[in-house]
């Protein structure tokens, strides 16, 4: 079961946001929340909010436990770029690019391992081996 949450037009460059999301991939949701609380990167606070939103979506919409969730995907794509200008010497102007990005988190529930049923061949082999060892 996949649960998604997204953050659009986040006012931070994609490069800076990728630094944090790269480390989150594959982590359990609880571990990732603890890590995000301790990191001092600028985007970690907003990614923590996004992670909490994704966990709330999973609990509310699909009745999943937070302990079973892990981060399957963390995508950061570039968004629109706001173009501003700064006055410079001799009447010139230089461009300032204020970059944005879109972040998408995908959580999945880890399936608990179920006891496998032995096939007939496996059970017959086990019986034969036990008979041989007894005689």
Feature annotation, model-predicted:
Residues 1-125, 132:
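Structured, basic alpha/beta domains of bacterial-type, RNA-associated proteins
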């Amino acid at each position: 079961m996949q649960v998604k949450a997204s953050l659009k037009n986040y006012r931070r460059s994609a490069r800076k946001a990728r630094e944090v999301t790269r480390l989150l991939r594959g982590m359990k949701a609880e571990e990732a929340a603890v890590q995000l609380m301790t990191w001092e990167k600028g985007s970690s606070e907003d990614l923590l909010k996004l992670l909490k939103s994704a966990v709330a979506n999973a609990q509310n919409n699909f009745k999943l436990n937070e302990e079973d969730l892990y981060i399957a995907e963390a995508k950061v794509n570039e968004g629109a770029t706001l173009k501003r200008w700064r006055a410079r010497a001799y009447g010139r102007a230089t461009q300032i690019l204020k970059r944005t990005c879109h972040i998408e988190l995908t959580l999945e529930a880890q399936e608990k391992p179920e006891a496998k049923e032995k096939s007939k061949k496996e059970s017959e082999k086990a019986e034969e081996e036990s008979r041989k060892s007894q005689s």
